[in-house]
From Swiss-Prot:
Organism: Xenopus laevis
Coiled coil: none
Family of this protein: Belongs to the Churchill family.
Binding site for Zn(2+) 2: 30, 33, 61, 64
Official protein name in the record: Protein Churchill
Amino acids binding Zn(2+) 1: 2, 5, 30, 66
Function: Transcriptional activator that mediates FGF signaling during neural development. Plays a role in the regulation of cell movement. Does not bind DNA by itself.
Keywords of this entry: Activator, Developmental protein, Metal-binding, Transcription, Transcription regulation, Zinc
Length: 112
């Protein structure tokens, strides 16, 4: 992974978890060839361990094939919530939790 290719390493993305794609606003240019071109997604794998889906891939420079960052995305269901996480030097770090119920109990206002 290369900190010289990005503006900020592991930026906080709040609840934005990317299963695929690249956060190009954080991409400066390839430190190896000094070009700012498309970022390829290579070596993509999907695995499931103990009910957790894990997707990993590499962000790679289109021109010189320099590996910019390694991306990891996870998805799991815990109790009544879908849990998402993302960790990537280019795309950032993020977590999200979404209720599988029609009305999220955490969003309901107290009656009293």
């Amino acid at each position: 992974m290369c900190g010289g290719c990005v503006q900020q390493e592991y930026p906080d993305r709040g609840s934005t978890c990317l299963e695929t794609g690249s956060y190009l606003l954080n991409y400066v240019s390839c430190v190896q060839c000094n070009k700012r071109d498309f970022v390829l997604i290579v070596n993509k794998t999907a695995a499931e361990e103990d009910g957790e889906e894990i997707i990993t891939y590499d962000h790679m420079c289109k021109n010189c094939h320099h590996v910019i960052a390694k991306h990891e995305y996870t998805f799991s269901v815990v109790d009544d919530y879908q849990e998402y996480t993302m960790l990537c030097m280019l795309c950032g770090r993020a977590e999200d939790s979404v209720s599988v119920l029609p009305d999220d109990p955490r969003q309901m206002a107290p009656l009293f």
